[in-house]
Amino acid sequence: MENTATAAKAKLEVKNLNFYYGKFHAIRNVNMSIRENKVTAFIGPSGCGKSTLLRTFNRMFELYPGQRAEGEILLDGENLLTSKTDISLIRAKVGMVFQKPTPFPMSIYDNIAFGVRLFERLSKGEMDERVEWALSKAALWNEVKDKLHQSGNSLSGGQQQRLCIARGVAIKPEVLLLDEPCSALDPISTAKIEELIAELKHEYTVVIVTHNMQQAARCSDYTAYMYLGELMEYGATDQIFVKPARKETEDYITGRFG
């Protein structure tokens, strides 16, 4: 594996990571450093393991029987994969937004407040401030401030995805995982999400899975190319897209493969 992502402080360190769906070996000996306050994109053909890798970062796989990870994922030096590490604290530090917008069946306000209430005790005034802060971070406040008590499902698809991002940042995580957040959105909504990602990296470490090569090139500082569960190449996005070290990477990016 070619690895040229050496600048900036590491927020997440992945060491000798292997992942299994039952007996199927889905992720093979991945080693990489995710840089702090940068956007890292995972690219690769369908089934290559990029979403699986993303979901190891907050142990989302534990919701499903028969799945297991081996190795280390260090968040500021703390191994997230050990049983000693509280899973609820991991998910407070490592937020996630899924491919399809998933607003909770409750008001816009309560969508934001729900996760906060799990981890903090805030007064009504403090919660109001947090809700406004999170919706502002997701560039949604001005669009919904007069209808906070309407259902989150009443919003458009693009607004729903920004609501999910606001919900993710409301608990003030350190890392934000985005699993193909724009795949179900129109170009205008996609552009808003991409602008939002550029803003979020100033306060969060962002990792995004995308099938869209142009999106990876536009949004990310670092890019990881995966194939058949292996990390084939990882480095600065400009280098990966302009002068990749491996022919396999070049073939995928230029459309000759995948």
UniProtKB/Swiss-Prot annotation:
This is Phosphate import ATP-binding protein PstB. Belongs to the ABC transporter superfamily. Phosphate importer (TC 3.A.1.7) family. It is found in: Cell inner membrane. The lineage of its organism: Bacteria, Pseudomonadati, Pseudomonadota, Betaproteobacteria, Burkholderiales. The keyword Acetylation does not apply. GO terms for molecular function: ATP binding; ATP hydrolysis activity; ATPase-coupled phosphate ion transmembrane transporter activity. Pfam families: ABC_tran (PF00005). Part of the ABC transporter complex PstSACB involved in phosphate import. Responsible for energy coupling to the transport system.
